[in-house]
């Protein structure tokens, strides 16, 4: 199995280490040629979403990756990656891939709680460690979106067809269960194409 990892900015190395420990080949995606390579899954890591969005376009990666996501390529998106997938951003006109029917608020926890750690229930996996770093959260979800996790009432994890979006960083805690769930969804072929929306 080969998974593409967006590697233009952000915490991509940590994702790669977990995937490699799970026996998965990683392809770092750094330019348009990389973005057009065949992969069986895609990781959109944390980082700075505005910078990532700008680089995706400048490096000719935006359209080929968006086409893959729309066609049903399984995606695991964390923190900034969630922002890239979101159809709508609160108090922000910016839009990126816009393939995940959720409304996301950037830096939702403010400066005092900009970074924190907790353990909460995640789908059927039980309690998992969650590290939040200047994290967004999901204000609302559209039809067909499964809520996987909440922290103090705020939605921090969702699944929609081929896309898993997380507010937190599962790659920073050494717990492999979420990555394994993502890989299992690839192996099981559970992902499905998402509806095309105009950008």
UniProtKB/Swiss-Prot annotation:
SUPFAM superfamilies assigned: Class I glutamine amidotransferase-like
Positions contributing to L-glutamine binding: 47-49, 106, 133-134
Keyword Lyase: yes
Biological-process GO terms, alphabetical: glutamine catabolic process; pyridoxal phosphate biosynthetic process; pyridoxine metabolic process
Keyword Ribonucleoprotein annotated: no
UniProt keywords, alphabetically: Glutamine amidotransferase, Hydrolase, Lyase, Pyridoxal phosphate
GO molecular function: glutaminase activity; pyridoxal 5'-phosphate synthase (glutamine hydrolysing) activity
PROSITE patterns: PDXT_SNO_1, PDXT_SNO_2
Catalytic machinery residues: 79, 169, 171
Stored Pfam families: SNO
EC number: 4.3.3.6, 3.5.1.2
Reaction(s) this enzyme catalyzes, per UniProt: aldehydo-D-ribose 5-phosphate + D-glyceraldehyde 3-phosphate + L-glutamine = pyridoxal 5'-phosphate + L-glutamate + phosphate + 3 H2O + H(+); L-glutamine + H2O = L-glutamate + NH4(+)
Associated pathway: Cofactor biosynthesis; pyridoxal 5'-phosphate biosynthesis
Record's subunit section: In the presence of PdxS, forms a dodecamer of heterodimers. Only shows activity in the heterodimer.
Function summary: Catalyzes the hydrolysis of glutamine to glutamate and ammonia as part of the biosynthesis of pyridoxal 5'-phosphate. The resulting ammonia molecule is channeled to the active site of PdxS.
PANTHER family xref list: PYRIDOXAL 5'-PHOSPHATE SYNTHASE SUBUNIT SNO, PYRIDOXAL 5'-PHOSPHATE SYNTHASE SUBUNIT SNO1-RELATED
Family, per entry: Belongs to the glutaminase PdxT/SNO family.
Protein name (Swiss-Prot/TrEMBL): Pyridoxal 5'-phosphate synthase subunit PdxT
